[in-house]
């Protein structure tokens, strides 16, 4: 179907039947070699190189299942486990499954019932001849991007202490709907007392984080690093993908992103308003009635004096915050415009949109 093809193109899912991924062909990815896996585990090179793992290869099946599970949680965080294997410098995620855990809008933790479910699920895999082991966990960040909070870092650090090698993946379902591409990130923590290079801890400055999360965002960046994520499939995956997709094809055609993400968009606009209010105060404004005047005066002076540097009127950090605020506003407007366009197309095709 066209929508499935679009999903695969948007997420750059590579067919390994014809194009190897990260130097690994189809047999490397799909064949489980017990001897090879035991040799890698026995060598445990990640103990001497904290950044040994640099890449994550995720199957198209696992990607779709994680995205659907994250979306099903709405504003509540969900959690699941990933199964697969290890290759040199690389995690291979073949499949995933959700955990029956209780989450909130800010955190999710596996309790005793979740641990019991994991044990039973792994035994079920062995019973049907699936030899993949757990290689990590995933959870959702509804609306606030892919990064690790302090709680996430502590959870991942403990997992790496007792279940190495282990990976943490974060999915943002709200931004996935807005962008049409799965918003996903993969991370690992550094050993205790390890000091990583500064460039390794620099997070994506273009990532927009809600004001309520700003304090936690980046506060633990020296404790973990991000891995490159890419996606793969084979011709054997096509039937499974079609089955997964066909369960939701009607909703895919009839639903509008502008309506699905209505609450999320409202929160984005409110958050942007609060950020702008703080920026105005930081730029010298003291009252709500005069917010924005200081920045307009600085812009006017810069227009009249071409060599004027706006950094003279605000600190570098404030100017970067203004730049991010502008980008956030443009992104919100762009997403809304695309949503309105898709809504109009659906109305012309079906007469109305749900």
From Swiss-Prot:
GO molecular function: deNEDDylase activity; metal ion binding; metallopeptidase activity
Region called Disordered, residue ranges: 193-212
Keyword Nucleus carried by entry: yes
Transmembrane spans: none
Pfam family, one: CSN5_C
Binding-site residues for Zn(2+), renumbered to this chain: 139, 141, 152
Annotated GO CC locations: COP9 signalosome; cytoplasm
GO terms under biological process: protein deneddylation; proteolysis; regulation of cell cycle
Subcellular location: Cytoplasm; Nucleus
Enzyme class: hydrolase
InterPro entries: CSN5_C, JAMM/MPN+_dom, JAMM_MPN+_peptidase_M67A, MPN
Domain of life, per lineage: Eukaryota
Motif (JAMM motif) on chain: 139-152
Domain MPN residue range list: 56-193
Keyword Transit peptide in record: no
UniProt entry keywords in alphabetical sequence: Cytoplasm, Hydrolase, Metal-binding, Metalloprotease, Nucleus, Protease, Signalosome, Zinc
EC number: 3.4.-.-
Domain notes: The JAMM motif is essential for the protease activity of the CSN complex resulting in deneddylation of cullins. It constitutes the catalytic center of the complex.
Subunit structure: Component of the COP9 signalosome (CSN) complex.
PANTHER family: EUKARYOTIC TRANSLATION INITIATION FACTOR 3 -RELATED
Job description of the protein: Catalytic Component of the COP9 signalosome (CSN) complex that acts as an regulator of the ubiquitin (Ubl) conjugation pathway by mediating the deneddylation of the cullin subunit of SCF-type E3 ubiquitin-protein ligase complexes.
Family: Belongs to the peptidase M67A family. CSN5 subfamily.
The name this protein goes by in its record: COP9 signalosome complex subunit 5
Annotated source species: Yarrowia lipolytica (strain CLIB 122 / E 150)
